[in-house]
A protein has these predicted regions:
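Class I SAM-dependent methyltransferase SAM/SAH-binding core
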Residues: 39, 43-80
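Short conserved loop adjoining the S-adenosyl-L-methionine
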Residues: 80-86
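S-adenosyl-L-methionine-dependent methyltransferase catalytic module, highlighting the catalytic core
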Residues: 106-110, 117-212
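A short SAM/SAH-binding and catalytic strip from SAM-dependent methyltransferases
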Residues: 91-103
Length: 213
């Protein structure tokens, strides 16, 4: 495998990855769905000693992961999660991939079937920057989290903090933890965002589990 196909470890790990890592217990079994070039999976392996597996749509991404010694296979979150066994992992992670799936609610069901817990992160489309961009420019918003033009983006199902919370309620999913990050990358606390998380939050991270019968 050509050395150029390997990733260069990032000096500053993405903020949502750091926060996801904090949610995971050391030594856990982890499935990273939509793992791209494996940066998060490698970070979890190094810092939490996880037994990590990955699923990635892009063959180029899979090649980079394998070149770096990660256990990753090529597959589609919409169609291939059904091949994984019930409860095969402690955590099933979907990091900024939900909005690119065709049936987000079905993918969530699969994550919660496969993992004891699901950790999902996504850009909040109700952030004030998105609202003002659309209101004043009349064009599809482009922000730090949404940095691809509408005609090239893989994102097809944008959602907001309130949308996702409502979906979890409709599906009977337990929200164990919610972390909201503002545009500067700082974690927002209840004292500084109160009821305005949906307006000022740029990225959302949820840890979910099935409701106990």
């Amino acid at each position: 495998m050509n050395e150029q196909e390997k990733f260069i470890p990032k000096r500053d790990i993405r903020v949502d990855w750091q926060l996801i890592a904090e949610m995971i217990k050391p030594g856990s079994r982890v499935l990273d769905v939509g793992c791209d070039d494996g940066q998060l999976l490698a970070h979890l392996t190094e810092t939490k000693n996880v037994d990590g597996r990955g699923l990635e749509l892009s063959q180029a991404g899979v090649n980079i992961c394998v070149a770096n010694g990660l256990s990753v296979v090529q597959g589609n979150a919409d169609t291939d999660l059904g091949f994984y066994p019930d409860g095969g992992f402690d955590y099933a992670i979907l990091s900024k991939t939900l909005q690119a799936t065709h049936q987000p609610h079905v993918v969530l069901e699969q994550l919660l079937r496969i993992g004891q817990r699901a950790i999902v992160s996504f850009p909040n489309f109700a952030n004030w920057r998105c609202r003002s961009y659309l209101a004043f420019k009349g064009r599809m918003p482009m922000t730090h989290s949404l940095d691809t033009p509408w005609y090239e983006t893989p994102n097809i199902h944008f959602c907001t903090l309130k949308d996702f919370t409502a979906l979890c309620g409709k599906m009977g999913v337990t929200i164990e933890q919610t972390v909201i990050v503002d545009a500067s990358g700082k974690v927002m606390t209840r004292t500084n965002y109160g009821a305005f998380a949906n307006l000022f939050g740029a990225d959302c991270i949820f840890m979910l589990s099935k409701k106990k019968a």
